[in-house]
């Protein structure tokens, strides 16, 4: 065999060895099936944790899917189709109140504000909530926290939902933006980056933040079935470590830097739109500094649910939210 042939053979063997090593390494990672409620820049710390390899550092590989609704995400978790469900705790409360034995438990929090911004099709020179009186808002699903927060904010500003203003609630989350852009409604409450895209096309203007108006609350949380959480706490501990690394990374980097990292999760969105969206969420303190769920914020969520008529009585924090794992993650950093 010629010297050149030997070199080619050695290179080929080296490539195969690297591929086999990578495959073996991947096989050593424990797969976590994660269902997120929607795809939004609002969940930037999660995407950073995936993109920067923080889960791999914990021996985990995330199989990420998007449910497009808290109800759908909760159903997937209950059925065992996923290991972790990322959605609003309102779904957990509803399931518990239906008498489920192996109910869902939240173990780590990612967001503590409503992620919706409020857009006007034809904005006044200066926005006031009085402007919406007699108009039509493209809202969200009845019973979901985005819709309940919108109603809360309207009431706090003297506007009675469905009486002083029409609210469209029958559209699927992913269809609402297209309907508004096609001419439906005078206003819309929606997550980023959808509204910044509309604004860039000159078809509306962001005039307010529902999250800033509604105040801090337990908004989007990682959940597991109670039995699974108790059976394998180490899995969820490692998962929470990775999420907290994502939180810390986002806190210590600019909107531009974060946007570049999460861009692969939004292949159809221009980078400048992602940067703007990140800046909007940073401006309202959308993310808590730790994954520990706040009892006071959970109570505020239930206050909003009670006001919306979606809850008859408050559920004790300790029943549905478990802070021990997130608290342990913080202890490890001391």
Model-based region annotation:
Residues 1-31, 331-334:
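Short, low-complexity disordered leader/linker segments with a strong preference
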Residues 27-162, 166-172, 179, 186-192, ...:
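Short, glycine-/small- and polar/acidic-enriched structural segments
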Residues 40, 67-71, 86, 144-145, ...:
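Soluble non-cytosolic domains of exported or imported proteins
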Residues 47, 93, 151, 196, ...:
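Predominant activation on well-ordered alpha-helical scaffold segments within soluble catalytic domains
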Residues 50-51, 56, 155, 199-200, ...:
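Short polybasic/polar patches that bind polyanions
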Residues 91, 122, 173-267:
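Pocket-lining segment of extracytoplasmic ligand-binding domains
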Residues 230-312:
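Secondary-structure end/capping motifs
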Residues 302-334:
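Conserved C-terminal helix/tail region of periplasmic/extracytoplasmic solute-binding proteins
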């Amino acid at each position: 065999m010629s010297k050149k042939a030997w070199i080619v053979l050695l290179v080929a063997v080296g490539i195969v060895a690297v591929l086999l090593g990578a495959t073996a390494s991947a096989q050593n990672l424990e797969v976590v099936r994660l269902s997120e409620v929607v795809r939004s820049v609002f969940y930037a710390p999660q995407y950073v944790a995936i993109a920067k390899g923080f889960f791999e550092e914990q021996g985990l590989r995330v199989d990420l899917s998007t449910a497009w609704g808290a109800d759908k995400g909760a159903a997937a978790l209950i059925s065992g189709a996923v290991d972790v469900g990322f959605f609003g705790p309102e779904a957990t409360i509803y399931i518990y109140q239906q008498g489920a034995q192996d109910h869902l438990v939240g173990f780590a929090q990612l967001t503590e504000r409503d992620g919706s911004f409020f857009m006007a099709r034809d904005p006044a020179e200066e926005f006031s909530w009085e402007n919406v009186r007699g108009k039509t808002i493209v809202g969200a699903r009845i019973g979901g926290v985005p819709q309940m927060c919108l109603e809360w904010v309207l009431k706090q500003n003297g506007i009675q939902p469905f009486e002083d203003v029409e609210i469209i609630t029958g559209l699927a989350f992913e269809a609402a933006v297209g309907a508004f852009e096609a001419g439906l409604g005078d206003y819309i409450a929606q997550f980023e980056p959808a509204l910044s895209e509309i604004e860039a096309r000159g078809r509306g203007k962001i005039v307010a933040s529902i999250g800033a108006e509604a105040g801090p609350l337990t908004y989007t949380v990682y959940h597991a079935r109670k039995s699974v959480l108790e059976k394998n706490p180490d899995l969820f501990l490692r998962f929470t470590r990775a999420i907290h690394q994502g939180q810390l990374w986002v806190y210590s980097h600019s909107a531009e830097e974060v946007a570049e990292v999460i861009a692969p999760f939004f292949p159809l969105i221009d980078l400048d739109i992602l940067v703007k969206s990140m800046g909007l969420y940073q401006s309202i303190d959308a993310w808590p500094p730790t994954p520990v769920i706040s009892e006071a914020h959970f109570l505020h969520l239930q206050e909003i649910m009670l006001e919306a008529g979606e809850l008859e009585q408050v559920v004790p924090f300790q029943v549905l939210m478990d802070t021990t794992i997130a608290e342990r993650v913080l202890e490890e950093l001391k």
